[in-house]
């Protein structure tokens, strides 16, 4: 029983840690874009030194790797929202929901690390300037569209996690 209590009590801090470290990764990638660090392959392929700062920020999600990092960041925002705003829900249920979200996170992080790493380096040889952001993505709509879309898409993972947690607990009614 003590072991279960430790696992249950560690769910919320782990969710907050997941968000914190994902946010740090996202800020680091955004910083590489703003600093025109073309030694990072993703930056070299989706930005250049003449791109305005606001498009450099949106270039972070201008390709697959950065878009996936944004997806994972928003997923971690939803996860920490469940951890923080679930005060009226039994602690065991919240822990199960966070465990389901954590398992999905592990899958996302493994996919990102193994196939879609946005921090892949071009060292020792890298271009003086980048290839530029796709001109179709240099639009105000692309500044707000992907984050808004992902908030909705990824938000459904919370409903999924609650459904799976209810199935695990056998609690399929309103009690």
Walk through the language-model features, giving the residues of each.
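Polytopic transmembrane helical bundles with strong interfacial aromatic enrichment
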Residues: 1-175
């Amino acid at each position: 029983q003590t072991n279960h209590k430790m696992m249950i009590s560690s769910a919320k801090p782990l969710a907050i840690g997941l968000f914190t470290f994902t946010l740090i990764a996202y800020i680091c990638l955004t910083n590489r874009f703003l600093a025109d660090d073309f030694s990072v392959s993703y930056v070299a392929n989706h930005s250049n030194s003449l791109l305005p700062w606001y498009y450099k920020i949106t270039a972070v999600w201008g390709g697959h790797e950065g878009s996936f990092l944004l997806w994972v960041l928003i997923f971690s925002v939803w996860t920490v929202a469940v951890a923080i705003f679930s005060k009226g829900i039994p602690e065991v249920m919240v822990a199960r929901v966070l465990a389901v979200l954590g398992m999905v996170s592990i899958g996302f992080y493994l996919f990102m690390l193994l196939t879609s790493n946005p921090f892949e380096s071009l060292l020792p040889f890298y271009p003086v300037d980048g290839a530029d952001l796709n001109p179709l993505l240099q639009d105000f709509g692309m500044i707000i569209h992907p984050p808004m879309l992902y908030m909705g898409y990824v938000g459904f993972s919370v409903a999924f996690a609650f459904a799976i947690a209810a199935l695990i607990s056998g609690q399929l009614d309103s009690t």
